[in-house]
């Protein structure tokens, strides 16, 4: 679970990255699709070019990071705050919840690239814990 310190670190970092969140989301999603090609199955209607600069990846990256922003605002109740998104991914999109952890890995990587001075080991730990809790909350409707 997230401590008060973890929550404060995540909120402080989000304040810094929110303005670039769409760009970070596109980079994270694009990296995931290249590095973990099995995830492309969920985006087959987008064609073969799924790099970070393609319009579809840029748009969905922005959607993903908007959801992360919503999660930051709902940090004290992630399951409730992400309930509709969990339902969408479980019942309509049928996304394997293991992919949430893969995306979280790529989000962490991209944050560290864009904000190296802010991404201390302590912040890394808090963000990792937060994204693990977010992935768990998104998996709630799968049970």
From Swiss-Prot:
- Keyword flag Heme: yes
Q: Which GO terms describe its biological process?
A: hydrogen peroxide catabolic process
**Family annotation (Pfam families):** Globin
The protein's matches in InterPro entries, at most eight in alphabetical order, are given as: Globin, Globin-like_sf, Globin/Proto, Hemoglobin_a-typ, Hemoglobin_oxygen_transport
- Keyword Kinase attached: no
Q: Which residues cross the membrane?
A: none
State the UniProt keywords alphabetically. Answer: Acetylation, Heme, Iron, Metal-binding, Oxygen transport, Transport
GO CC terms: blood microparticle; haptoglobin-hemoglobin complex; hemoglobin complex
Q: Which residues bind heme b?
A: 89
* Residues given in the record as O2 binding sites: 60
| Annotated ranges, domain Globin | 1-143
Cite the record's tissue specificity text: Red blood cells.
| Modified residues annotated as N-acetylserine in this record | 1
Q: Name one GO molecular function term.
A: oxygen carrier activity
Q: What does this protein do?
A: Involved in oxygen transport from gills to the various peripheral tissues.
The record describes its quaternary structure and partners as: Heterotetramer of two alpha chains and two beta chains.
Similarity remark: Belongs to the globin family.
What is the protein's name according to its record? Hemoglobin subunit alpha
Q: From which organism does this entry originate? A: Leiostomus xanthurus (Spot)
- Gene name of the record: hba
């Amino acid at each position: 679970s997230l401590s008060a310190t973890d929550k404060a670190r995540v909120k402080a970092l989000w304040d810094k990255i929110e303005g670039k969140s769409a760009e970070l989301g596109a980079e994270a999603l694009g990296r995931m699709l290249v590095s973990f090609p099995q995830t492309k199955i969920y985006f087959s209607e987008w064609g073969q070019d799924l790099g970070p600069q393609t319009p579809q990846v840029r748009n969905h990256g922005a959607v993903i990071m908007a959801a992360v922003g919503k999660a930051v605002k709902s940090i004290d109740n992630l399951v409730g705050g992400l309930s509709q998104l969990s339902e969408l991914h479980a019942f309509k999109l049928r996304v394997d919840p293991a992919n949430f952890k893969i995306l979280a890995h790529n989000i962490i990587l991209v944050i560290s690239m864009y904000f190296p001075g802010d991404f201390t080991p302590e912040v890394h730990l808090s963000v990792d814990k937060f994204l693990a809790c977010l992935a768990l909350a998104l998996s709630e409707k799968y049970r």
